[in-house]
């Protein structure tokens, strides 16, 4: 089962985290579910984030990417693939 790992970083430490089941290509829905569970606003997803996520399976959102104020420094998301298939990094 593939998962999306959502981390809320404050002062260079993981303040909160959530693992959400996530098939490849459904990261927006999984991120929305994680944001709801963590009770944080949904970030603005830019082309920069899409490119980073597709290339590295990882991206980060800072306070510039949220409409509302946030109680953390940044949100990092990472796709964890447990299917055994290797992706080129």
Could you describe each region identified by the protein language model?
Residues 1-19:
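Short, extreme N-terminal segment that most often corresponds to the first beta-strand
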Residues 14-41:
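Short, flexible N-terminal segments of the mature chain
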Residues 31-89:
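Acidic, low-complexity intrinsically disordered segments
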Residues 10, 22-24, 81:
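Non-catalytic surface loops within mature trypsin-like serine protease
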């Amino acid at each position: 089962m593939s998962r999306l790992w959502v981390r809320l970083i404050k002062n260079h430490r993981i303040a909160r985290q959530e693992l959400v089941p996530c098939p490849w290509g459904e990261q927006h829905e999984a991120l929305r579910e994680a944001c709801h569970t963590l009770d944080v606003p949904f970030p603005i997803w830019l082309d920069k984030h899409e490119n980073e996520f597709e290339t590295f399976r990882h991206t980060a959102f800072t306070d510039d990417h949220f409409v509302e104020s946030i109680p953390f420094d940044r949100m990092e998301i990472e796709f964890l693939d447990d299917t055994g298939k290797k992706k080129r990094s």
